[in-house]
Amino acid sequence: MGLEAISTDYETVDVFVGDRVDGVATVELNRPNSRNALNGQLRSELKAVIDEVPETDVRVVVLTGAEDTGAFVAGADVTELRERDALEQREASKRPRVYEVIDGCPMPVIARINGHALGGGCELIQASDIRIAHENAKIGQPEINLGIIPGGGGTQRLPRLVGEGHAMRMILTGELIDAKEAQEIGLVDEVHGEESFDERVYEIAASIAAKSPVALEFAKKSIKAASRMDLESGIEYEAELFAQLFATGHKDEGIDAFFEDREPEWDDV
């Protein structure tokens, strides 16, 4: 079953495949009355959609908030948190959660940060592979203001992206930062105004989608391993993935296309 089919089954997630670029799925979070606050339903439906990606021909996922919601994700659903006790929270925290599913998706995930990405929204962009922000976006981990801490990986992924100092400041103060500062500290990769925002997001998506899907998956795995293994283990892992590519037709197609001065045809491999 493709993403086109399953997208109609959900109330809080919309999926558009190939509407902007062939091989690219735009996954829109859509809880307009709550600015995409992450409740159990939204987390579950987003996880289900991302789980389907490897079963399709999609090569890149663009994750974003629906335009009429006014946000990427404005945080967790505080009403839901208020009613939850410790036992219920432990159950809700069982892995793999949506953050791990995005992190582990074989296909690259681009976070199109079209508005505020707070709390769980900030953690969703941290789990993504490339982060492109609208110049008006605000980003932060304000959980400390509610007497809690980030619970979706923020205390672990954020320091790996921006360093311990910036992560401490953001998490301990709960202050929001603008897109420009987020880029300066390494939390987002690029910032664009309204005129160039979508153009750049889908330019990057198209560039990635044109590459070998097998090489993309292996490259993502190897890069992710850099923060999870010691250097020697990581180098050995990279070498093994590199060698495995020599057992695929993708290596042959890519090199043949280079010498024949043509675009590779990955679908025919």
For the regions a language model picked out, list residue spans one by one:
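Helix-loop "lid/cap" segments that line or gate small-molecule binding pockets
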Residues: 170, 182, 222-226, 241-246
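Short loop-to-helix capping motifs
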Residues: 31-32, 211, 261
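Amphipathic alpha-helical segments at domain termini/boundaries
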Residues: 1-26, 175-208, 217-226, 254, ...
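A structural preference for short, pocket-lining loop segments at secondary-structure junctions
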Residues: 22-30, 41-86, 101-111, 130, ...
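A short acidic, glycine-rich active-site loop
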Residues: 82-96
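Crotonase-fold acyl-CoA enzyme core
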Residues: 103-213, 248
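Glycine-rich phosphate-binding loop at the start of an alpha helix
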Residues: 75, 92, 96, 119, ...
